[in-house]
Regions:
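Acidic/histidine-enriched active-site and ligand-binding environments that engage anionic O-linkages
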Residues: 117-126
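Residue-level detector of anion-binding/catalytic polar loops
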Residues: 71, 99, 124
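Phosphate-binding site of ATP-dependent enzymes
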Residues: 141-187
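Short acidic-hydrophobic, aromatic-tinged amphipathic segments that line or gate anion-handling sites
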Residues: 13-20, 102-110, 139-142
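Structural element of the ATP-grasp superfamily
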Residues: 65, 89-94
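A polyampholytic, Gly/Pro-enriched intrinsically disordered region
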Residues: 92-103
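Glycine-rich phosphate-binding loop of ATP-grasp-fold ATP-dependent ligases
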Residues: 102-103, 125-150, 170-172
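ATP-binding N-terminal substructure of ATP-dependent carboxylate-amine bond-forming enzymes
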Residues: 1-82, 111-112
Length: 187
């Protein structure tokens, strides 16, 4: 919008920075950028710098936001990271009675071990590491050759989610806990 949109702000000058490797890096860069800090301060109301929402954030983001007086409107980065772990969310879902694709949570040392721990799930498996974005750490494995392609990424994890491969329709479900209850909606 070339600075013309009333609800959008982007700094005009680029400040030297390390290469961005994550959304968190971008947020942290912006929270340290002098133009962004000046913009936030110039829009303060009675000394209140306001509140911030971030798609992704980490402990550094929280520290930077706090340093300029912003209140992050999410649970802590530590809790977000815990809940972003697919192994943890699987355990929470099962505890809450949410039906899950048949699965087992286990470390994997090699293909033979994978087959042993997933024997009840059949020949065609889906293996997910605890963290990943947009399917980059979801692996479809039905033989040793396919396993070997991803072995290093799978074996290095303390625990992975191993699921029976099913034919399903793709969808996303988002949940939000508020003071009024929990909202769950497909997107």
């Amino acid at each position: 919008y070339d600075g013309q949109h009333p609800n959008l702000f982007s700094p005009k000058e680029e400040v030297p920075h390390d290469e961005f490797t994550s959304i968190e890096d971008i947020n942290n860069y912006l929270l340290q950028h002098p133009e962004v800090i000046n913009f936030i301060k110039s829009n303060a109301v009675n000394g209140d710098m306001g509140k911030a929402l971030f798609l992704m954030f980490d402990e550094k983001t929280e520290q930077l936001a706090k340093a300029i007086g912003l209140d992050v409107c999410f649970p802590s980065a530590q809790l977000r990271m815990f809940l972003d772990n697919k192994v943890n969310t699987n355990r929470i879902a099962e505890k809450a009675g949410v039906a899950c694709v048949p699965n087992v949570l286990s470390p994997v040392t090699d293909y033979k071990h994978l087959k042993q721990v997933s024997e009840k799930l059949g020949e065609s498996l889906v293996v997910q590491t605890p963290f990943g974005d947009s399917g980059h750490t979801t692996f479809f494995i039905s033989n040793e050759e396919e396993f070997n392609t991803y072995a290093e990424e799978i074996i290095k994890e303390k625990e992975v989610k191993i699921m029976k491969r099913i034919n399903c329709y793709g969808t996303a479900i988002e949940g939000c806990v508020t003071q009024h209850g929990t909202l769950v909606a497909p997107l």
